[in-house]
Amino acid sequence: MDKFTLQSDEIESILKNHLKIESKVMSIETLLGNVRMRKKIVYDPYYQRNYVWDTDKATYFIESILLGTEIPPLVFFKTEQGTIEVIDGRQRYETLSKFLNGNLALTKKGLTSLKSLHKQKYSDMNEKIQDLYLDTKIRIIEFSIVNEPKLTDRQEDLIKKEILSFQPMQLFG
């Protein structure tokens, strides 16, 4: 394998023979409340777009969680160094974190059903709602490369790009 590039057959070989895919379910409390876990997660790798959700969209997302709506999974890539990069779901991940850390007050415009939560931050909510939020399960799909010679950063980026081009059924079908 060339040190700087991967040919399509090399990418295919890595994806078929060396790509480990794990599906996990984790509570928001475990995902964001565990200091050790939080230190490993890089939610803003250089190839991700910046956080772009406005407070109305972020509010709508938080309300969806509180109402029990199914949300798309977060997609992680575990590097050889043990860090976990968010390769899909940065907006969702960062919104979850902002809300829990008190950096997001819910807006009237973003709330469709739970209007009484207008202007509230996580810390303003009653314990029942806080527990509901923390106990909410988030689906996570985690990719990693196993049994493969060390990849360069560029090669790893090419693999991540390929992962993002899959449709969900291609991953598990």
Kindly label every feature range from the protein language model.
Residues E12-V42:
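N- or domain-start disorder-to-order transition segments that initiate the globular core
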Residues D2-D9, I14-E22, P45-G173:
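Basic- and aromatic-enriched surface patches that contact anionic nucleotides/nucleic acids
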